[in-house]
Amino acid sequence: MTTDKKSKSKSSEKSTQEVEQVIKPEKTPILDTSKWPLLLKNYDQLSVRTGHYTPIPNGHSPLKRPIKEYVKYGIINLDKPSNPSSHEVVAWIRTILRVTKTGHSGTLDPKVTGCLIVCIERATRLVKSQQGAGKEYIGIVRLHGAIEGTTELSKAVDTLTGALFQRPPQKSAVKKRLRVRTIHNSKLLEFDPERNLGLIWVDCEAGTYIRTLCVHIGLLMGVGGHMQELRRVRSGIMSEKKGQVTMHDVKDAQYEYDNSKDESYLRRVIQPLEAILTNYKRIVVKDSAINAICYGAKLMIPGLLRYEQDIESNEEVVLITTKGEAIAIGIAQMTTASMATCDHGVVATIKRVIMDRDVYPVRWGLGPKAKVKKEMIKDGKLDKFGKPNEKTPSDWTNTYTYYTGQVATTTTTSPVESMNVDTPKKATASVAVKAEVESSEDEKPVPKKEKKDKKEKKKDSSDDESEEEKSSKKDKKEKKEKKEKKEKKSSKDDSDDESSKKEKKDKKRKKSSDKDSDSEKESSDKKDKKDKKEKKKSKN
């Protein structure tokens, strides 16, 4: 019997071993975040500050926004047509999409075609960042004479790289002053010796004039030259290879949405604004801190979730939500090492807010200190900005620290003391809160008798000071009175002089009027005499 039991137990063990070998546990699936869209790409490679936060059911993923918000937070990678100006094209898109605000990422001349990033509504806040981004062009140079071979031309094109002096051409509506522009790279792609046409590719800084570059190439070749045609291939991060649309596409997409309510074409034409920001380093923010940032607050350490590696201080970064929405463009105040180690401090200041206010709920002012502060503001113990005033208790000023800087407390005095104390003494009485905090930590509670003695000493000292101040005040008053007397005298003298001048003028006027009247009388007498003589002659 015992042998049978042992054999059964051995067989059961073997069976369990076989089962363990046959049914293996499933491996945990690995998230492939490399395929996640836009700003969430490679999300798992970001450094983690904390994984604990409360997700709020607000906001939308950039690609899943409602169509009105999608258009409001959208950009268009437009292939600009040849004859209209950039401003005309942008105005046409504004009327087609029926939006209030549009902008573009750097003007193109009317005859130039190619990449023009059109920003819609809230995306216009990113126009400045895109105008300063690098550009790529492909242009045709026409030389004014024949040249021997293409090697010299390719050398001339290669030499025109780096920092160059450029003056805007006569056609441009810009002030014609000398500028410095850097050309990162340039190549000669083709050359047609029969027609003296060369095809060049240029990677340059924003604001470079390819027209003047073509003139310089002609000067280097010794035959002269000018630009025949130009096309922008890349503007910032957007190129003609991906997602470029024409004006007809925009018009058709809006027509489809208006008539058949089909959003798919409009979503294909318009891209989310996050597509422009993929080259920025990212900082992921907690949902509770988003609305404060939209109101202009700095990002502090408690609001930080994840951050990119190799962030340096004073570097431009993009602040994003856990859903991948862009909140703002900020300037990093910490490196990645300090973000990982610091317990408090400012992570980034805000350069440009992108997201609308109140998309996420207000989550500030909910802590215990904030509630006490609100009650004190209601009771009048703090002013409307939450800063101390006359009624603030000393416990509050001694314990509460103001992170916005030094805050001066206004102190009041009794009417008797205010008679004795001068204004500069009042100014010295207002002390910064930090200084009060330090002094209060060192001081111990003082008994009442000592307080009375101190008050009496202060009164005595104030009496001594008041006597000196009174004497100084008297001197000042006397000086003022003397000055006033002098001013009155001078004003009287001036008035006397003016009155005398007026009298003289009146006398002159009277004399002149008397003379005029005498002369009139004489002339009338002469006339009468003449008339009498003529009458006598006529009688005779």
Curated annotation (Swiss-Prot):
Alphabetic keyword roster: Coiled coil, Isomerase, Nucleus, Ribonucleoprotein, Ribosome biogenesis, RNA-binding, rRNA processing
EC number, as in UniProt: 5.4.99.-
Extent of Basic residues compositional bias: 473-489, 529-540
InterPro entries (UniProt xref): Dyskerin-like, PsdUridine_synth_cat_dom_sf, PsdUridine_synth_N, PUA, PUA-like_sf, PUA_sf, tRNA_PsdUridine_synth_B_fam, TruB_C
Location of the region described as Disordered in the Swiss-Prot/TrEMBL record: 1-24, 414-540
Localization (cell): Nucleus, Nucleolus
Coiled coil: 448-494
Catalyzed reactions per annotation: a uridine in RNA = a pseudouridine in RNA
Domain PUA residue range list: 280-355
GO cellular component, one term: box H/ACA snoRNP complex
Domain of life of the native organism: Eukaryota
Known function: Plays a central role in ribosomal RNA processing. Probable catalytic subunit of H/ACA small nucleolar ribonucleoprotein (H/ACA snoRNP) complex, which catalyzes pseudouridylation of rRNA. This involves the isomerization of uridine such that the ribose is subsequently attached to C5, instead of the normal N1. Pseudouridine ('psi') residues may serve to stabilize the conformation of rRNAs.
Quaternary state and interactors: Component of the small nucleolar ribonucleoprotein particles containing H/ACA-type snoRNAs (H/ACA snoRNPs).
The name this protein goes by in its record: Probable H/ACA ribonucleoprotein complex subunit 4
Protein source organism: Dictyostelium discoideum (Social amoeba)
Gene behind the chain: nola4
